[in-house]
Amino acid sequence: MIFIGLMGMMDPPRQEVPQAVELTHKAGVKTYIITGDYGPTAEAIARQVGMVSSKNPRIITGAELETFSEIRLSKVIKTNEEIIFSRVSPEHKLKIISALKKNGEIVAMTGDGVNDAPALKRADIGIAMGIAGTDVSREASNMVLADDSYGTIVTAIEEGRKIYQNLRKFVFYTFSCNIGELITIFASIMLGLPAPLTAVLILCVDLGTDVLPAIALGVETGEPDIMEKPPRNPKERILKKSFIFHFAYLGIFIGSIVTGYFYFVLKQYNYTEGNEEAYLKAATSAFILLVFIQMWSAVNSRSFSHSAFKIGFFKNPHLMGAILISILIAFCMAEIPYLQEILGTTHLTAKEWITIIAASSTIFILEELRKALFKGKLA
């Protein structure tokens, strides 16, 4: 026998996988290899993509899984950070998924073959391959990867987190502003003051200047550390106590500032019952102040833990555009004679505009101080 040569074959992982795995680790997402390959082969691939880093990761074979009860497997998964499942059959995949679910995990399973269909169905999120996957696996899955790329899963996780964050930002902005309006009206009644905001002006705020920034917050880009936070508890509500307290105290602050400034202008112009000029000045000032405060509040709402200076004011051009349009609308309402007659507003001097802008910025300063001193405490 004459030795001619030795040939080896290798199916390397895609180039984007190591970076995607690193992102999942930072995001607190556990990744397991479940394969029919030989254990050391699976370990070598896992090391190559960064799924394991310890010297001796736990390798569980299909034969071992046969001897494990679901409870024991759940404990093994809990007590071992790095596990590789090798030489497994489709039935074993179902057992692994059940054990992970028993530990309270939300399980996403990838697969491309007919034999992966039961596991894809059992998982919370079944992910099939769009190119290499079979029709059966695609029908059994919840999501199909059009490019068969693991990196796309990570992108989907990031997009999901962005959507959830933006929903909270929208709720926070809307609730804090509406509470501010309620406090303004309620406080004025309790203090025996005339109405600072007429029904028409409230509608102008809620249906005019308030709407565009709220919509723009829905297309906010993700925060810098969005993929460095652990997954949230699936049972966690959007309106948790700290979140409610946060927008409630800001709403009270908004109401207090607007009511206080309304009272200040009434006194400044020596308001008495029937003094229409003094009332119009005070009401217009309160309205414009409320609009400007809400614009600052929209800037604050972009992040509950990061300074607006760190995020950058112009990274969301939609929001900046919405704020400019809202301010322009408010300016027209106060300064155009035709609209003054309809809305019950009056002209403000340059000094009054500057004073209002300065007063409105207090909410921005307050939130910047909170973020610096109590980062994320009320998020």
Regions found by a protein language model. Give the residues of each.
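Residue-level signature of catalytic and energy-coupling elements of molecular machines
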Residues: 1, 24, 37, 42, ...
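Flexible loop/turn segments at secondary-structure boundaries
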Residues: 13, 39-41, 92-94, 116-117, ...
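Charge-patterned, long linear interaction tracts outside catalytic cores
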Residues: 98-117, 125, 200, 213
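Amphipathic alpha-helical transducer elements in NTP-driven molecular machines
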Residues: 14-18, 39, 70, 93-94, ...
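C-terminal transmembrane helices and immediately adjacent loops/tails
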Residues: 156-379
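Mg2+-dependent phosphoryl-transfer enzymes with acidic/Ser/Thr/Gly-rich catalytic loops
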Residues: 115-178, 219, 223-227
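Cytosolic catalytic headpieces and adjacent flexible linkers of membrane translocases
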Residues: 1-99, 103, 117, 123, ...
